[in-house]
């Protein structure tokens, strides 16, 4: 392949030599390769005194070797670089002053150079040449003439070459070749060198070249060994000497990577992840201190974390025992271990029971003084209870002759439940009368015990001893455990409820009738706000005032407490039942049911045909009528009198009753809030459909974005369904 004539003008190619890749480079580089120059350092302005400097040699292109140049350009200083990206060119030919293609011996022998040339060299390069003559070896110069080969290239890669020396050796040998030319053509040689370098240095790559400033200052004669040590570290001479793992400063290349580094090769770039780290590293990467998650080498240490977890568990296992063993008085300690299967009582339970013990003994001491009229009532009610509740009791009632199986006095609720659930066991003594008392209510004198019962010793018995029970489980015992009831209920409601003879928790309400109007008592669901005046809400501990109340006879409050609860209980059960059924409480007769059905239908119709009501004015007369009527049905006045209001009745009495909860015509102890809420709920249900409808109509007509339309409409429908369901 012969080069084009334009190329021949620039460069004469040796015909015997097979052109290698570097000789194929175009004389006029294409546009594409021009941008590469921007990465390289700028070329310096030509200056005669710096003619010999390695900057020239550096900026020269890799393929411009002197053996290819014609005689016209023989005077150009050589620009071949030893680290050229292409394969090394055989330096078979060196320059004589006259014939272009004569072969020559080693350049560095000073005999081959004319005297004037050696004289014209700067003193630095002369000293360099002398040193080279002493220390020169083919190892140092892999491209010395005749040895340039692939082998030497490999050896060059293995050997880190001190760059600075090489620059000077090259400049010496090239300049010596160039300056051998007669001195008169100095100008032309300079111009041609400029042209060639500017033409061909464009495709030079920055990473292959050295910036010119790494050159020694021209006057200095620093010892070469220092430079070889320092420069080989600071400058990446060949591809092989490039550091195997990157680090911010090359002096640390030989330091081994820090201990816990995530990636061993990129040790300093990545933040060290060792657990031993005393201070956060200065790397910009966010620090994870002693992170076992991110560090693969710490996976073996992970089990330590898992071992660290069990001690709290062990402590938890130990803690109930500790509570049982140490925190309890001896009386409680005896029965505590006897509950193997049951959940361990929590600390509040035990505290409450401890609180309870002295109070109960006080009550027992105070008991025998109470005698008189309430006892007769007690006997009557207990007889009635025996008759009415016999089907509910699971075992025969104890008589005086039977010894009672020794049972702990104050068992935890779980124990009680365990005793009561197997039906074969005799029930606790206090079972039968218990239903006739609201759960938390403290003693009222009607429950005072009969004097023949040996109650105080029973109260103070240690749990293990057998009890000598009275003839029948008269309610006289119930006061002993009565003050305890709210606490136990608060502790374990599910277990106490079967005790009380109630239905399980799911069912709303149970009323126990003992035959007399005074004894019908409702056991409201736990947490219910409607408790009588003396009754404890189940969450509270016993207050001292209430324990006092329990301990002493209180004749005056007995009257009001005894009588009103009957209608209230009826009302509450009806309310709840109505809530479950159709949300219309208080219907006692079929006519009332029909009326309710009528109102329900009317409610539905009002919901389906809202335009009758306008948003601003509220519901029309008919709807207000039935609103008031639902409120009237909700109000307990109607229930208590047993009269039901018809569907067309006017709302006045019910409004009076519901707006003023303390109006004296219904029982004062019943709280008034539910009625107001009920009333409000009915009104809201009546008005809601129209409000929703009108607003959605407004929105439909409004010119707003579709999304907000949709959102608002969806919201109104949600509210509508929630409130009016």
From Swiss-Prot:
Membrane topology: Peripheral membrane protein
Keyword Membrane attached: yes
Region (Disordered): 1-93, 177-226, 256-340, 396-481, 508-528, 584-624, 638-675
Principal place of residence: membrane
Compositionally biased tracts (Basic and acidic residues): 297-307, 314-326
Keyword Methyltransferase: no
UniProt keyword list: Cell membrane, Cell projection, Membrane
Chain's role: May inhibit the adenylyl cyclase-stimulating activity of guanine nucleotide-binding protein G(s) subunit alpha which is produced from the same locus in a different open reading frame.
Name under which the protein is recorded: Protein ALEX
Source organism of the structure: Mus musculus
Organism lineage string: Eukaryota, Metazoa, Chordata, Craniata, Vertebrata
UniProt gene name: Gnas
């Amino acid at each position: 392949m012969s080069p084009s004539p334009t190329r021949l003008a620039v460069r004469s190619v040796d015909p015997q030599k097979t052109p290698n890749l570097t000789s194929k480079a175009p004389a006029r580089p294409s546009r594409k390769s021009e941008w590469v120059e921007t990465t390289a350092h700028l070329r310096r302005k030509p200056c005669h005194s710096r003619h010999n400097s390695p900057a020239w040699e550096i900026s020269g292109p890799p393929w411009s070797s002197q053996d290819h140049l014609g005689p016209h350009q023989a005077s150009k200083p050589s620009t071949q670089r030893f680290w050229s990206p292409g394969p090394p060119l055989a330096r078979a030919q060196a320059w004589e002053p006259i014939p272009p293609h004569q072969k020559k011996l080693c350049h560095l022998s000073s005999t081959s150079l004319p005297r004037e040339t050696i004289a014209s060299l700067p003193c630095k390069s002369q000293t360099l040449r002398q040193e080279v003559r002493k220390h020169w070896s083919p190892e140092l110069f892999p491209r010395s003439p005749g040895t340039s080969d692939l082998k030497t290239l490999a050896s060059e890669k293995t050997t880190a070459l001190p760059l600075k020396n090489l620059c000077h050796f090259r400049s010496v040998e090239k300049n010596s070749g160039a300056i051998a030319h007669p001195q008169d053509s100095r100008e032309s040689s300079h111009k041609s060198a400029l042209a060639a370098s500017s033409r061909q240095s464009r495709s030079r790559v920055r990473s292959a070249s050295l910036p010119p400033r790494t050159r020694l200052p021209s006057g200095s004669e620093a010892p070469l060994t220092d430079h070889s040590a320092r420069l080989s570290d600071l400058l990446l001479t060949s591809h092989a000497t490039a550091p195997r793992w990157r680090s911010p400063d090359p002096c640390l290349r030989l330091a081994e990577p820090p201990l816990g580094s995530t990636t061993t090769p990129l040790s300093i770039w990545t933040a060290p992840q060792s657990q031993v780290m005393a201070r956060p590293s200065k790397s910009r990467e966010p620090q994870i201190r002693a992170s076992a998650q991110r560090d693969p080498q710490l996976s073996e240490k992970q089990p330590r974390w898992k071992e660290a977890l069990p001690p709290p568990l062990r402590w938890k296992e130990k803690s109930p025992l500790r509570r049982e063993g140490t925190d309890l008085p001896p009386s409680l300690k005896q029965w505590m271990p006897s509950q193997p299967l049951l959940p361990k009582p929590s600390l509040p339970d035990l505290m409450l029971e401890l609180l309870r013990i002295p109070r109960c003994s006080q009550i027992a001491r105070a008991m025998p003084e109470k005698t008189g009229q309430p006892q007769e009532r007690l006997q009557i009610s207990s007889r009635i209870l025996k008759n009415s509740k016999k089907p509910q009791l699971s075992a025969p009632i104890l008589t005086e002759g039977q010894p009672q199986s020794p049972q702990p006095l104050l068992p935890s609720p779980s124990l009680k439940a365990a005793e009561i659930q197997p039906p074969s066991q005799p029930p606790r003594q206090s079972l039968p009368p218990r239903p006739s008392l609201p759960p938390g209510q403290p003693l009222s004198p009607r429950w005072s015990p009969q004097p023949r019962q040996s109650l105080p010793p029973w109260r103070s018995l240690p749990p293990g001893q057998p009890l000598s029970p009275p003839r029948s489980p008269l309610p006289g015992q119930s006061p002993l455990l009565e003050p305890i009831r709210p606490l136990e209920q608060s502790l374990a409601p599910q277990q106490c409820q079967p005790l009380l003879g109630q239905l399980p928790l799911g069912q709303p309400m149970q009323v126990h009738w003992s035959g007399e109007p005074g004894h019908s008592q409702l056991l409201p669901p736990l947490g219910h706000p409607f408790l009588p005046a003396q009754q404890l809400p189940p969450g509270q501990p016993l207050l001292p005032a209430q324990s006092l109340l329990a301990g002493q006879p209180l004749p005056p409050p007995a009257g009001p407490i005894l009588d009103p609860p009957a209608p209230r209980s009826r009302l509450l059960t009806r309310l709840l039942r109505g809530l479950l059924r159709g949300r219309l409480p208080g219907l006692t007769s079929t006519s009332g049911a029909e009326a309710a059905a009528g109102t329900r239908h009317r409610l539905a119709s009002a919901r389906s045909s809202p335009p009758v009501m306008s948003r601003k004015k509220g519901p029309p007369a008919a709807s207000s009528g039935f609103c008031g009527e639902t409120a009237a049905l909700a109000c307990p006045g109607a229930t208590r009198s047993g009269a039901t209001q018809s569907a067309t009745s006017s709302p006045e009495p019910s409004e009076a009753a519901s707006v003023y909860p303390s109006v004296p015509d219904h029982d004062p102890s019943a709280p008034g809030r539910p009625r107001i809420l009920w009333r409000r709920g009915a009104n809201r249900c009546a008005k809601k459909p129209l409000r929703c409808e009108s607003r959605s109509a407004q929105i439909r007509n409004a010119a707003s974005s579709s999304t907000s339309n949709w959102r608002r409409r969806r919201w109104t429908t949600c509210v509508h369904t929630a409130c009016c369901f």
